[in-house]
Amino acid sequence: MISFQNISKIYPPHSFGKPTIAIEDVSFKVNKKEFVLIVGRSGAGKTTLLKLLLAEEKPTKGRVFFDGQDVHKIKPANFFKLRRRIGTVFQDYKLFPSKTTYENIAYVMEVMGASEEEISRNVSEVLKIVGLTNRAYNFPEELSGGERQRVAIARALIHRPEVILADEPTGNLDPYNTLDIIRLLLKIHEFGATVILATHDKEIINILGKRVITLEEGRIIRDEEKGRFIF
């Protein structure tokens, strides 16, 4: 489903400095309905990999394929088709402070031109999935960190994507809320979504027992079917 083929990403130097190698000659595949962890220390290249898949960054070398299509050859006018198939969750939530939980989730469908009936039905469904039905009309400032992240996950789910990309989604959370978010990602995976989770949290890595791709200085140093935290 997803294939990185000999990908390198090198950023040009600032002033008289050296170029920054974010990713170097990385190749791997992610199968449909797989749950994969991309792990490594800060600066290892995890976020860059996700940005390359979303076509937010262009590789210096190599190709990234999604369902057989080179994502960097998609015309800008057709990017929305790729983005509809991929839901994204970030560490900093990226919620609109002036919108309620319901409105933050509904916004995605409004942009897609969905009817009010569709929006109401789908938002109610995802609120139930993430356990926030009773917080539908609260604003972000009235929610805990764990609740805000669940809103972000609900928003990522609203258009029923095939793939969920989660970039350090528990980085700002306490251990209790961290486990809550991980259980939710596992639930989404059970529904049939492919999940790619970028993290450096050793507890998450060890608890899940899923495939682990370990990055170090932009290179893959391990790719294990049931990996554990090893740095």
Language model features: what each stretch is:
Residues 139-143, 147:
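Conserved ABC ATPase signature
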Residues 164-167:
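Catalytic Walker B motif of ABC-type/P-loop ATPase nucleotide-binding domains
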Residues 99-106:
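Short coil-to-helix segment of the ABC ATPase nucleotide-binding domain corresponding to the Q-loop/switch region
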Residues 54:
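Helix-to-loop junction immediately C-terminal to a conserved catalytic motif
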Residues 62-70, 82:
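Conserved ABC transporter NBD signature motif
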Residues 158-162:
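A short, proline-enriched helix->beta-strand linker immediately N-terminal to the Walker B motif
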